[in-house]
């Protein structure tokens, strides 16, 4: 009985202490208990970084701060536990609470939305930084007196002042690095914009279509919550109102729009995946007409199969991309809410598999009988049709458009003024003279570094003596994006801790690319060489240099592999892997390569298979963590050739891919940048196994003619495969123009008025037009060989002159730049009967008889290829 009273007294004391510490952040008791359980599991997983990450939560924080911190740590991705400390997350939590108290809309936001769409720092797979505090300080006074909807629009204008669109590589820069660069791809723009909105207590989430159905690309944008509902905006692309963007029409053709939600979210949206750390939701119905389709998985006798893995796949980039991976229930059923296009549905269990195309327009259920086994060789052709094109269906007044356009131009000037603070060539040449460096080479690196130029100048100035010979090789080894955000400390760490070869010290190129280079794949660059060199003793490092297999064994025995915890796909840094002793397979592979390089052993991820490799005894050696290692003699030579009837040279991830069968599904090999595939025939050395070659010919309306060839690679037998692109139907005339009306509106010179013309109505500052320009730049030589006559049409002299002075220099030599009398962008669509709208660019090919041969409106990837195929 006495023990019972002591227990009651203890509960009362804890309760009174809780009251003194303030109100709960997690107000629902059952939810709070679930967070505590998850926090305990995460703390156990991250036990090797308890002091750095978790200890602060037990330091007597105010109750709401403690619960908020436990919530964040409980559901964080593994990389965040490995590479960031608890005080980093606590400072962001305090900034979030301060923002909630600052703005009038803070008290109107439901707790659940604040918890999942304001509090988390991470948006996607970016490097995390202190942007929340920086952005809040800059935005607070600017938006404090606005309504929530007005504040959203104003924040997006601020984002446009800082950042505009330009394509970059797949690694996602941090928000502050994107601001420093002043441009980013859509994934970086949307990550930055979500970070800015959350910094001022506006619930925001990055949403994206992982692959378009009608075009070989994807797109990311932002949803914001205001007035009791979710709205969308184009990141760094301000419109006068919410729910208006250039991608409104393309999104109506999407097959999936989704977003990952941090934590145990209880919202009403359609759930694609429920993980213990996050939820993936399907929000396609916010943008397009949808339909739920079903897969019924059966065995060879027709009985339902439980727990079969099922993927709903979409053709894009010459592969079948899994929009959703799920599992059949006890009735053999699973489902997916999607758009009205075509998909490939693939099911597998216990080595058996089945697949079938589904036309969502006409079907709602596909039966998949698991009767196929790996090894059967055959070829089949399929046509995959995207959802039908539809108009955007929104409009804003001309006065609002003009006011917004004027403001956008002003914001462009603000951004340009910032860009003029970057180092110029005169300063670069003076620095080169002082340091006795090649001025043109130094200027190249400084020009590419943009707002990060000080890191490069400081690095150049800190090198001396014979080591300076390795300055440019190090800067050449990292990517262009690395130049824009690599810290000075990373450059110095690699420079000071690399084992430089002497005059006869082996292959210098190998050293530059695979020892000196800090970049392994898409990881966050932190100093790691000095860190790892201190952690491993000299005897071990010496043994690794004579036998890199010693490091392989150390990694196998020391690093625990967790396949699920790093759901953000942001790799752990090498230092983070060492400290945590837990990693996902990809981060483990990066760690192995980085550790090899730190010890003077050349290492890399093999470009096609992405397997870690080390260079030893003049050969590359695969590292098969947990897999059977193949010798070079066991590999099979595959020769690829292009069919002579192909009307273009096939390009990897555009016209074809190679896929290897693995655990019931085919997965693409990554040969995108491999120079061997630059000409045909070419040879690849591959592991024996079951393979699929996918080729695709995307037609002008987005339909794909796909060819699937299943084949085996057998040890000791060379194999040849021919890349065959299916022929498109005969070219159709889409409509016929009255050429007199065309000439009356557009001042086309008489000398070319009877020839084939490419007309392009332009909006140079918008992302769809920039994609079109990038297509033309990539196909410039081919267009010139075709003697293509391109006429770019602009609204005004400023747009025209700015374009000519910038990108115009990279356009085909026969291009003309004109201002039509009316800028009637609906002239061509109206003639063809296609849906018209206000989205640019409008690109058309007209022959000398006024017949419209080709038409593209708005966002479209591959216009350059389309035009080349259409020109005669």
What are these regions (language model features)?
Residues 291-302, 332, 634-648:
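A short, amphipathic beta-strand motif
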Residues 805-840:
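Short, internal strand/loop/helix patches
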Residues 27-181, 217, 400-580, 626-627:
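Secondary-structure boundary elements
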Residues 316-337, 662-680:
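Short, acidic Ser/Thr/Gly-rich low-complexity loop/linker segments typical of extracellular
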Residues 23-27, 40, 141-146, 151-157, ...:
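Hydrophobic/aromatic-rich core segments of domains that either
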Residues 227, 330-344, 349-352, 358-365, ...:
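Short Pro-Gly-centered beta-turn/loop motif in secreted/extracellular proteins
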Residues 747-776, 789-793:
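Short active-site neighborhood of thiol/selenol oxidoreductases, capturing the structured segment around
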Residues 838-858:
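A short, hydrophobic beta-strand/beta-hairpin element that forms part of a small beta-sheet core
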């Amino acid at each position: 009985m006495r023990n019972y009273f002591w227990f009651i007294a203890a509960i009362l004391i804890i309760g009174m202490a809780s009251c003194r510490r303030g109100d709960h952040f997690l107000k629902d008791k059952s939810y709070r208990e679930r967070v505590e359980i998850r926090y305990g599991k995460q703390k156990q997983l991250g036990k090797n970084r308890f002091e750095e990450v978790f200890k602060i939560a037990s330091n007597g924080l105010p109750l709401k701060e403690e619960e908020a911190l436990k919530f964040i740590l409980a559901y964080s991705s593994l990389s965040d536990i490995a590479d960031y400390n608890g005080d980093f997350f606590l400072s962001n939590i305090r900034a979030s609470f301060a923002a909630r108290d600052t703005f009038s809309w803070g008290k109107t936001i439901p707790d659940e939305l604040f918890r999942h769409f304001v509090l988390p720092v991470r948006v996607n797979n970016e490097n995390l930084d202190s942007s929340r505090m920086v952005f809040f300080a800059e935005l607070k006074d600017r938006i404090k007196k606005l309504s929530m909807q007005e504040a959203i629009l104003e924040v997006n204008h601020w984002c446009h002042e800082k950042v505009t669109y330009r394509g970059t590589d797949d690694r996602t820069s941090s928000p502050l690095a994107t601001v420093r660069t002043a441009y980013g791809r859509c994934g970086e723009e949307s990550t930055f914009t979500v970070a800015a909105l959350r910094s001022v207590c506006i619930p925001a989430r990055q949403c994206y279509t992982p692959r378009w159905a009608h075009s070989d690309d994807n797109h990311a944008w932002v949803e914001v919550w205001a007035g009791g509902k979710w709205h969308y905006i184009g990141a760094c692309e301000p419109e006068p109102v919410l729910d208006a963007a250039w991608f409104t029409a393309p999104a109506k053709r999407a097959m999936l729009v989704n977003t990952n939600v941090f934590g145990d979210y209880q919202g009403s949206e359609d759930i694609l995946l429920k993980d213990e750390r996050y939820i993936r939701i399907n929000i396609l119905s916010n943008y397009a007409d949808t339909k739920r389709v079903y897969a019924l998985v059966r065995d060879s006798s027709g009985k339902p199969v439980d727990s079969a893995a099922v993927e709903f796949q979409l053709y894009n980039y010459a592969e079948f991309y899994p929009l959703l991976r799920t599992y059949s229930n006890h009735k053999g059923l699973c489902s997916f809410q999607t758009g009205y296009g075509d998909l490939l549905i693939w099911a597998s269990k216990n080595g058996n598999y089945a697949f079938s195309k589904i036309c969502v327009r006409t079907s709602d259920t596909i039966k998949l009988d698991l009767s196929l086994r790996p090894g059967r060789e055959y070829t089949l052709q399929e046509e995959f049709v995207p959802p039908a094109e539809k108009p955007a269906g929104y409009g804003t007044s001309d006065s609002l458009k003009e006011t917004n356009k004027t403001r956008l131009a002003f914001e462009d000037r603000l951004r340009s003024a910032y860009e003029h603070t970057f180092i110029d060539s005169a300063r670069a040449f003076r620095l080169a003279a002082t340091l006795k460096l090649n001025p043109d080479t130094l200027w190249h690196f400084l020009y590419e570094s943009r707002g990060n130029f000080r890191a490069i100048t400081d690095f150049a100035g800190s090198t001396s003596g014979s080591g300076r010979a390795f300055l440019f090789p190090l800067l050449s080894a990292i990517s262009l994006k690395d130049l824009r955000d690599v810290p000075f400390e990373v450059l110095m760490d690699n420079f000071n801790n690399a084992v430089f070869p002497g005059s006869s010290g082996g292959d210098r190129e190998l050293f530059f690319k695979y020892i000196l280079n800090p970049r392994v794949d898409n990881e966050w660059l932190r100093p790691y060489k000095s860190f790892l060199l201190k952690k491993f003793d000299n005897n071990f490092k010496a043994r690794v240099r004579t036998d890199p297999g010693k490091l392989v064994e150390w990694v196998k025995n020391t690093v625990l592999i967790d396949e699920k915890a790093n759901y953000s796909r942001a790799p752990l840094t090498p230092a983070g892997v060492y400290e945590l002793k837990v990693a996902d397979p990809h981060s483990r592979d990066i760690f192995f390569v980085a550790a090899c390089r730190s010890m003077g052993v050349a290492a890399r991820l093999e470009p096609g298979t992405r397997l870690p490799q080390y260079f030893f005894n003049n050969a590359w050696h695969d590292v098969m963590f947990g897999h059977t290692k193949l010798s070079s003699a066991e590999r099979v030579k595959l020769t690829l050739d292009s069919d002579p009837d192909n009307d273009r040279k096939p390009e990897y991830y555009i016209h074809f891919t190679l896929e290897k069968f693995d655990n019931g599904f085919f997965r693409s090999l990554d040969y995108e940048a491999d120079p061997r595939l630059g000409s045909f025939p070419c040879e690849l050395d591959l592991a024996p196994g079951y393979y699929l070659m996918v080729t695709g010919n995307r037609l002008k309306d987005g339909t794909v003619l796909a060819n699937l060839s299943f084949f085996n690679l057998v040890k000791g037998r060379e194999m040849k495969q021919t890349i065959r692109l299916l022929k498109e139907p005969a070219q159709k005339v889409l409509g016929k123009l009255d050429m007199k009306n065309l000439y009356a509106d557009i001042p086309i010179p008489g000398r070319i008025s009877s020839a084939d013309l490419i007309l392009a109505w332009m909006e140079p500052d918008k992302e769809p037009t920039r994609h079109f320009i990038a297509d033309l730049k990539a196909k410039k030589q081919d267009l010139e060989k075709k003697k293509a006559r391109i006429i770019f049409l602009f609204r005004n002299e400023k747009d025209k002159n700015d374009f000519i002075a910038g990108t115009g220099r990279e356009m085909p030599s026969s291009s003309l730049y004109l201002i039509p009398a009316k800028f009637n962008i609906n002239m061509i669509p109206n003639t063809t009967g296609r849906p018209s709208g206000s989205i640019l660019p409008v690109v058309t090919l007209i022959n000398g008889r006024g017949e419209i041969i080709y038409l593209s409106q708005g966002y479209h990837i591959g216009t350059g290829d389309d035009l080349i195929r259409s020109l005669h």
